[in-house]
């Protein structure tokens, strides 16, 4: 798994699992809204009145309608508190 996926996948999976409504802003400024039905390495399937397959390279920002619960196991090591070193 690529390093960039270590934060992206747990975040998108939490949005999908908890059925949190999202606003997805594309690089051209268009705003899409719905719930994440599914995703893979390249696309997100967004469900609203219709299903839309959105290519990740076209996405600028994903904004959840409410806070997403984070589990410590989902956080990459770079986001965990640093261990104190003995000096």
Swiss-Prot record:
The gene is hfq. It comes from Vibrio cholerae serotype O1 (strain ATCC 39315 / El Tor Inaba N16961). It comes from the Bacteria. Residues 9-68 form the Sm domain. Keywords: RNA-binding, Stress response, Virulence. This is RNA-binding protein Hfq. GO terms for molecular function: RNA binding. InterPro entries: Hfq, LSM_dom_sf, Sm. HAMAP family: Hfq.
